[in-house]
Regions:
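Non-catalytic, soluble scaffold/interaction modules
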Residues: 1-112
Length: 112
């Protein structure tokens, strides 16, 4: 995968790399917008958000740390996660394809 400079960065909390379209999920009302392979981008997660992890290729949250809900559940599902990525909801465009690197803690745009 070829990539450019990170769009956002944060705490690497679940290792691996995944590519997919950004899905901005701000409230439970947005849950139905998630599709398999989407990159879940949100402020934070709690147990009510757990079903979304089955669909997500990766998770990016604006808050949290290594022991946050998003980090723990992402590791359980073995999907990459970057938490504490300040500004992710405003910097990442809904539907834009990104590469999430949960080992480095970066989210980059994809080049052709």
């Amino acid at each position: 995968m070829t990539s450019v400079a990170p769009l956002v960065s944060g705490v690497p909390s679940s290792p691996g790399q995944a590519r997919g379209p950004v899905r901005l999920v701000r409230t439970v009302d947005d849950f139905a917008r998630m599709r398999p392979g989407d990159v879940l981008v949100c402020r934070t997660t709690d147990p009510a958000w757990t079903p979304l992890f089955r669909l997500a290729a990766a998770v990016v949250t604006e808050t949290g740390g290594l022991l946050s809900h998003a980090s723990i559940v992402a590791r359980e599902y073995r999907i990459p996660a970057v938490v504490g990525a300040t500004g992710a909801l405003s910097l990442l465009g809904d539907g834009t394809t990104v590469i999430v690197d949960g080992t480095l803690g970066t989210v980059t745009g994809q080049t052709r």
